[in-house]
């Protein structure tokens, strides 16, 4: 059953075929509904569960990530990335990640690259790391107002594919992260090279986060896939918010809060879990935002040929918001 198209549709973008075609009044509607859905879907509570799975998947994810990345890049490349991330992450969190990465790399050097043990460990690492992706898939399914309809194997294979995609995107980001400074050294630049290199690196990180979120928003929910233009807006907004929020979070932890006095030896874990929770909130918020953008228009936002409302296989595409 479809909903009737609201009055003054031309002022609210009910016939918009792209995000850019939604007028100001429509954007106000989208933002209001996004805030309401954040509360209705208990996003902050759901994000705590997703953040917990992120923490559990940290070691397996680093194992899988480094196992592939070390085939393409030296270990120093990943340490360079952690040094840059230290600018937006609390010191205790960066130290914990660095320690875990060193352990993984040391274990890798003690084993034969083609051994059965390594291959088996890599597969298990993929599967364990996919637990966090499965949690995120469930969260974005809720954000898009859907219920899980996929079979057990379809759900888990999708999660595994998204996990592999995330690792591949991360590796390409690190390759670009390393190659950009090398390329700039051959250009006739002034003495401000160091500043320029550091500034150029950040769009690479933002781009990697945006691509990863776009893939998650498109393939993660249990629904017919949305067209690319209806997922990238939320991905871009979430990426920028994640970077800015991480900077503010780091400032708060290092200058205002004293988690070590309260949590003692567990302070690093607590801070890392809080950052994972914040990252999950931002990622789910991007999905909520995308969902309300689709909900604003009566035009088919799903892939393939245009279908009438009620036959699109996605709640927000099959219904138009009343306000």
Give a label for each model feature:
Residues 1-323:
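Membrane-embedded alpha-helices and immediately adjacent juxtamembrane helical segments
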């Amino acid at each position: 059953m479809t909903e009737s198209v609201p009055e003054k549709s031309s002022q609210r973008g009910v016939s918009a075929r792209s995000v850019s075609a939604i007028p100001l009044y429509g954007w106000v509607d989208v933002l209001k509904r996004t805030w309401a859905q954040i509360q209705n879907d208990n996003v902050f509570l759901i994000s705590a569960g997703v953040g917990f799975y992120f923490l559990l998947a940290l070691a397996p994810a680093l194992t899988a990530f480094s196992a592939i990345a070390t085939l393409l890049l030296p270990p120093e490349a990943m340490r360079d990335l952690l040094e840059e991330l230290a600018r937006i992450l609390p010191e205790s969190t960066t130290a914990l990640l660095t320690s875990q990465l060193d352990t993984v790399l040391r274990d890798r050097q003690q084993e034969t690259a083609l051994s059965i043990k390594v291959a088996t460990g890599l597969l298990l690492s993929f599967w364990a790391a996919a637990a966090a992706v499965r949690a995120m898939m469930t969260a974005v399914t809720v954000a898009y107002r859907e219920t899980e309809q996929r079979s057990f194997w379809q759900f888990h294979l999708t999660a595994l594919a998204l996990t592999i995609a995330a690792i591949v995107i991360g590796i390409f980001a690190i390759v670009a992260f390393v190659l950009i400074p090398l390329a700039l050294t051959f250009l006739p630049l002034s003495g401000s090279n160091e500043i320029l290199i550091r500034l150029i690196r950040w769009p690479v990180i933002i781009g990697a986060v945006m691509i990863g979120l776009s893939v998650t928003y498109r393939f993660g929910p249990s629904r017919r896939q949305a067209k690319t233009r209806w997922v990238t807006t939320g991905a871009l907004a979430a990426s920028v918010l994640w970077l800015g929020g991480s900077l503010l979070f780091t400032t708060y932890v290092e200058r205002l809060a004293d988690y070590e006095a309260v949590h003692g030896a567990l302070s690093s874990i607590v801070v890392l879990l809080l950052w994972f929770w914040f990252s999950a909130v931002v990622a789910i918020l991007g999905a909520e935002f995308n969902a309300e953008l689709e909900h604003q228009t009566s035009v088919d936002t799903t892939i393939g040929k245009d279908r009438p409302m009620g036959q699109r296989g996605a709640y927000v595409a099959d219904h138009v918001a009343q306000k």
